[in-house]
């Protein structure tokens, strides 16, 4: 409380107080370093650069915010649902931090109106709001620390916009989402049961691996094949947002398309070989052509000899 009063007094002497007030309405407290929050709202298409000429965007803050958000929501869910299994806690957390939910939360608190991006860029996508929300969480963490960041999530986000009991019961079909993504992007996705074992209570446990274009994209365990597939698909959905992984997938996909070219090239030597046999055929026929010519010449000589005798 005292800190906010001091910040209010300082704010009176700042030229950029409107920006501070804007963030205060979202956060419930005044930022210490407002530049971090402004950078959290810079999409990579904005083409903003630092004084040294380096591009400024929210991608690094997004990376940090993703990890912090997982930790905070995991903390909240763990304490809210005592006695629940790890699979239940993981699924509940995933429903909160999935991109669709974060997109909606960004709009709810007004971040969508503050994001700076280029309208001419094709990189503008449906995940931009959710990515900015993660970057915003990263900014809070750097500016205020973990506890203040957790307080923001509990008081300003979850208590206002998320019903934990309701969302924990909501079924999300991650496998269907992954298959839909694969069809849209023309990627080959497969699910493989790689292990089956018993837990300490002798309950059967299944482990499934998801492969995208033959590359491992996620593994999941569960007390049924369906549950293990869902958990594996959930991990894969997160994995496909990693650009480095997707570069590897696209390279693998391009390699898979090359065998047809190799097969086409392998036919050419056979055609060439058959073509090289034609001179042999001509050489074989050549003696026959010469024999016929000899016969004609012999016949002509005989006719001339006969005419000479008559004379």
UniProtKB/Swiss-Prot annotation:
Annotated catalytic residues: 66, 134
Reaction equation(s) it catalyzes: Endonucleolytic cleavage to 5'-phosphomonoester
Domain of life: Bacteria
GO annotations of cellular component type: cytosol
GO MF term list: double-stranded RNA binding; metal ion binding; ribonuclease III activity; rRNA binding
A Pfam family: Ribonucleas_3_3
Subunit structure and binding partners: Homodimer.
Alphabetical list of PANTHER family matching this protein: RIBONUCLEASE 3, RIBONUCLEASE III
Name listed for the protein in its UniProt record: Ribonuclease 3
């Amino acid at each position: 409380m005292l800190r906010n009063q001091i910040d209010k007094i300082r704010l009176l002497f700042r030229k950029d107080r409107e920006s501070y007030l804007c963030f205060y309405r979202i956060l419930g407290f005044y930022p210490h370093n407002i530049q971090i929050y402004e950078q959290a709202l810079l999409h990579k298409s904005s083409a903003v650069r630092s004084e040294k000429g380096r591009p400024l965007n929210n991608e690094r803050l997004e990376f940090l915010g993703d990890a912090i958000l997982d930790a905070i929501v995991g903390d909240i869910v763990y304490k809210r649902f005592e006695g629940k299994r790890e699979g239940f806690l993981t699924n509940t957390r995933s429903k909160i931090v999935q991109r669709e939910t974060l997109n909606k939360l960004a709009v709810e608190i007004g971040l969508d109106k503050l994001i700076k991006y280029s309208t001419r860029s094709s990189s503008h996508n449906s995940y931009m709001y959710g990515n900015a929300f993660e970057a915003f969480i990263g900014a809070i963490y750097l500016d205020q620390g973990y506890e203040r960041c957790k307080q923001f999530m509990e008081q300003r986000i979850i208590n206002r916009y998320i019903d934990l009991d309701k969302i924990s019961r909501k079924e999300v079909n991650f496998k269907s989402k992954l298959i839909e993504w694969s069809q849209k992007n023309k990627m080959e996705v497969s699910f493989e049961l790689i292990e089956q074992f018993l837990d300490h209570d002798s309950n059967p446990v299944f482990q499934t691996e998801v492969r995208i274009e033959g590359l491992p994209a996620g593994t999941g365990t569960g007390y049924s094949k369906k549950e293990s597939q869902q958990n594996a698909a959930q991990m894969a959905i997160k994995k496909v947002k990693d650009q480095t992984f997707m570069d590897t997938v696209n390279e693998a996909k391009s390699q898979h398309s090359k065998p047809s070219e190799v097969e086409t090239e392998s036919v050419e030597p056979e055609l060439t070989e058959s073509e090289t046999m034609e001179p042999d055929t001509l050489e074989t026929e050549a003696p026959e052509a010469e024999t016929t010519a000899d016969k004609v010449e012999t016949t002509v000589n005989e006719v001339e000899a006969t005419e000479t005798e008559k004379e």
